[in-house]
Amino acid sequence: MTKKLFYFIAFLLVSISVSFTFSQRATAESYTSDFSNQLGTWEDLVGQVDRKISQGQLNIANQKLSTGYESISLNTDAGNRSSGDVQITFVYKGQTNFGLVFRAGTGNTKNYQSFAYMSNGNWQLGQPGGKWITDIHSQSLEIGQTYKLLLRYQGTSVKAYLNSKIIYDNPHVTYSDGSTINGDWTGATGLRLFGNLSQLLLLSLKTGEVNSIPEVLDTQQFINLRDKWKQQLITENYDSNNAPLVKYVNTLSKNAQTLYQSMNRSPERKELWPLKAGDTPSANLTTQFSNLYLLSQAYGTKGTDYYLNPELLADIQSGLDFMVSQKGYDGQKYYGNWWDWQVGIPQKFIGSLMILGDKLPSDKIQEYTKAIQSYVPNPYQQLYTKAQDVFVDLAFIPNFSTTGANRTDLALSVLGLGILQEDESKIELASNSIKEVFQTVTKGDGFYPDGSFIQHNNIPYTGSYGNVLVKGVGQILATTKDSSFEMDSQTVSNFVSTVEQSFIPLIYQGTMLPGVNGRSISRAPKDTQVGYGSTTMYNLLIVANLAPEESQKKLQEAVKYWMQTNPDYYLNNTRDYNDLQLTLSLMANTAITGDMLPFTGTKVFASMDRFVQNNPTYMTSLSLYSNRTSSFEAGNGENKRGWHTADGMFYLYNNDGVQFGNSYWPTVDPYRLPGTTVDTVALQDENSSFTTVTSPETWVGGAAAENQAVMGMALNKQGTKNNGTVLPMNLRAKKSWFVLEDQTIALGAGISGDTTASIETVVDNRLLNDAYHYQVISNKGNITDASEESKKDWLLLRSDHQNASIGYYFPTSSDVTVQSEKRTGTYAAINSAFPSDKTYSGEYRKFMINHGQHPQNANYAYVILPEATQEKLKNYTQDNTLKILANTESIQAVQMETAGYLGINFWAATGGSIADITTDKPISLLKQNKQTQTTYTIANPTQTNEIAHIQLPKDFKYILSMSDGVSFDEATHTLSIDFSGSAGSAKQIVVE
């Protein structure tokens, strides 16, 4: 065991060292470091230097010592040379007295040579002993700009280039005393700071043999990158026989005509277009740039009425000038929402510049990009949000680094700036900055090992911010593919794998599940758009285009499965030409059949308290919350009534075609969401800034395998806030769901609390399809009253359409209220940031169990049976195959022997005992019997790093397999499971 551990650690260390090779490479010929991963090895030859990596950059600063300010810091990883090339890329911040060191002898403070920028604006070349040449001139350095300084030295010859322009060329360097530069010295490369306290912000360091680093930029690569970006936005190849393309172009042309005709082109104008309803002042700026971008698309797309129209081009440029000079997007000041200035505007602005390209004067391109660069200096810095319509100086949040989708949004703009400014360092910075956003995390924002995606620290956001992240990363990787900036294949493969496991299980009929869309569920959809379906499909196609062959086919098969149910929808709702051509290519590819449901079975997303089950005819999902995950997010006037969306909300998708769709969120009763146990006391619309509410409880999660699962949630509403005020809620409950192939058994116990309203468990709250006919039937007959309450053994919501009926069985005859309710609403009522006054209506059927105002240890039990019929329900009630073994605060357990199913949630800190299974810790356990084999799937939903000891039934002889961290004591028949680092994921043992 000890030897194995030693070899494993040795292998791991070797693997780790290899993993850094992309960001820091050294060979006999060359060395490169972009400081994206590690600092490297440095040695102070003179003085003392502070070095740290922050936001993919090396910050290096000298200190004042008794000997003065002189400091020389050598990078020993770069090796020793007597001749070669050395290049640094740095951001100029107004500092002086800094430069390169070469041929530096380790340990000899008098044996080095230097090329440095001085306080008088000149450069100096020389070495200790008063041997300096100080009259080397270059263009003035401009604060905030990025520069590449390349030094080429060989014998007595020295050449220096600044941003590809030669500033010094001397084949035989001679000092004023007549001596020549020591060309035979061999030494290390480094950095020098002197004369005063100074800092240097370094983006990269490169060294190599003479002529190994090109002194002049390859401008063709920037042209190629710009063309690739441009071709994603427009097409210059128009085929009148391609019906979807013709429709796309005609729609673009029509939209452009509407915008162009309404554009204010007067010299005295105050706005280009009138303020759009709901726009804040900063959002209005984004809208104006978005309109100019659409006009740019029409100008560049062949087949529109405005293709290469010189009058439109002049008006677009005039509009851009107006927005920069008159509306304040000049790089100096800002107001309102940071997102508009750093994401919304730059992406549309850069898109316009990519399309217009060489149609605009080069000095205009530089003027525009310089303004954008002030707001987006790098992918890491984020501005504060300020008051609207009051200009203030740029204020970046100190000691802060962007994460997740915000990082990729900024990185995409930095990439665009790098291409337009022909700045390699910006392109490299953009690429390096996105690597960590799809590397898995264990806390905070990002993707987790189980596929969860978190943004804003504790909000499940795969469908919204996760989609933005994938789009941004995908576009960056697609743009740089087949260029010198292309990401290495392993990194791309890791990204693709992350996307596969994080997105595919969370999609139903092409739409992201609402439980992972955060506050975005309150945004009004476009008239033709369903949820986040089209956006997700297009993003997955972008990723598929980058993926290794096997993953590419998997993603394309998945997307085609969803798209081919309504291809016209996906062809007619594209964001740009790239979406259209990817969709057309997929639909025409006969090798991709799309005939298999992309995901079947169950999956627990423990790191965001979500669960899904997918079958060929229906899909279910659970939204829960804990001390790790917030119950909901409200902010920017969005999701004002999302209070109970994670109180155990149970999503059941079937063939009704309307559930959780466009009309659902503005019309559903927000106090009675399906699956929840709630205190229905009236709450105020949530208007506070980015509200999140976590629970005191840790026990949330479960265990899943194949198409079965057991899930649980310790519900605790104590500490719940409404607009910053702590509510007097004290509702508590233990809620469990036992999931089988064709049913979900829901148990509740320990339901206690006090309210002035009522505490209820919502069995279901179903939106009806207006085109379907429904009937509610109980074991006592048809229910036609608008509101009816009585004891019931079962209920059936019967539809005249296939796979749209649902049965509800109550194992212990329960008082169930049935209500019919017609509701109307608008998205404006739940979202003032993206308001829509369109009125939606919905007919609902509610099934509820009322626990009263002061329940103490109340409980419930019901079974949801998708696709049920009256006959199936009657048979189910008579079969007696369902056994509820326990429904208490300490244990909830269900057995279905005919399905080989046993599910147990042990709630107590000391565990418990039932069904010949004993544990000393709180766990969730799923036991599955198949012929002679039994599989135990066990999780610790509290996510504490504990060892659980579990005694199993003595009904097996052999252990076939065990997960890592699991051991078995045959003498006591006890499992020991180390849950350290499992983060809620389950362990398995298979026995026979």
Name every feature range the model reports, one short phrase each:
Residues 64-125:
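Secretory/extracellular carbohydrate-interaction modules
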Residues 170-206:
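Flexible glycan-contacting loops in extracellular carbohydrate-active proteins
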